[in-house]
């Protein structure tokens, strides 16, 4: 893929991460989950398009919006 597409994907990932952090400022245990997903997005680059549904499902477990056990 082109560099510009990768930059767009990166920018969208950063924007989403900032939005999620804003919504979860009182849940410090969720920061590491967000950082891991952000790093995953950067590393996977162009493959991110296929992984978006999987990442979103990981971010929304049935029991709670964020599961601190992911960080252990």
UniProtKB/Swiss-Prot annotation:
GO BP term, pick one:
transport of virus in host, cell to cell
Q: Which residues lie on this side of the membrane: Cytoplasmic?
A: 24-72
- Is Metal-binding given among the entry's keywords? no
Q: Pfam families given for it?
A: TGBp3
Alphabetical GO CC annotations of the entry are:
host cell endoplasmic reticulum membrane; membrane
Entry's localization field: Host endoplasmic reticulum membrane
**Keywords in UniProt for this one?**
Host endoplasmic reticulum, Host membrane, Membrane, Transmembrane, Transmembrane helix, Transport, Viral movement protein
Q: Which residues lie on this side of the membrane: Lumenal?
A: 1-2
Q: Which residues cross the membrane?
A: 3-23
SS bonds (residue pairs): none
Q: Does the keyword Ribonucleoprotein apply?
A: no
- Family, as annotated: Belongs to the Tymovirales TGBp3 protein family.
The entry's function note states: Plays a role in viral cell-to-cell propagation, by facilitating genome transport to neighboring plant cells through plasmosdesmata. May induce the formation of granular vesicles derived from the Endoplasmic reticulum, which align on actin filaments.
Misc. comment? TGBp1, TGBp2 and TGBp3 seem to act together for cell-to-cell propagation. TGBp1 is the main movement protein that physically cross the plasmodesma with the viral genome. TGBp2 and TGBp3 would facilitate TGBp1 function.
| Protein name, as recorded | Movement protein TGBp3
Q: Give the species this sequence originates from.
A: Lolium latent virus (isolate Lolium/USA/US1/-)
């Amino acid at each position: 893929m082109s560099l510009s597409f990768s930059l767009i994907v990166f920018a969208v990932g950063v924007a989403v991460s900032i939005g999620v952090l804003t919504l979860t400022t009182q849940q410090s245990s969720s920061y590491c989950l967000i950082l891991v997903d952000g790093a995953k997005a950067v590393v996977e680059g162009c493959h991110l398009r296929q992984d978006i549904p999987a990442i979103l499902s990981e971010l929304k477990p049935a029991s709670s919006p964020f599961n601190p056990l992911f960080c252990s």
